[in-house]
Amino acid sequence: YTQYMYNTMVINPAYAGSRGVMSIFGLHRTQWVGLDGAPTTNAISINTPIENSNLGVGLSFVNEKVGPTVENTISADISYTIQTSETYKLSFGVKGTANLFNLDVTKLNPVSTGDPLLQNLDNNFSPNVGAGVYLHSNKLYLGASVPNFFETKRYDDNSIAVYKERMNMYFIGGYVFDLSSN
């Protein structure tokens, strides 16, 4: 997922509720326009702090299409924020994810029909969990997260070719500069 800068909660559950107000986000991205099977990403998320508590919650949905594959992911996030100083807050978050991966073999042109490598590849469901930490103020933010702790095999155990989604660590940071006093 390359659009994390626009929707940090997708990769870091500690971001949920960190803005202090309800936030709704939507994104559509199409690459290689006009090319059949070109990558397309759609994402929508909502997150909010829970009033009179240190908790934040979020829900996100991501749909990605690449060639003959479609992947739908829905995630629920919860975060807990601690005021560490007058300026900084530190948030911890956990994420629960449900993922549905589908390969449409009718969009492929195999050399021979009945290839065993192309069997049992549709509607592969996989759950996952993740966690993150997010330090933020009005000017500075730093974060670290692992959105998916479990390695996910995309094809059945009998296949020779297996695609695995491995655990990734994400680090994010930034500072807001004032360009002028006006």
Predicted feature descriptions by range:
Residues Y1-N182:
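Subset of outer-membrane beta-barrel
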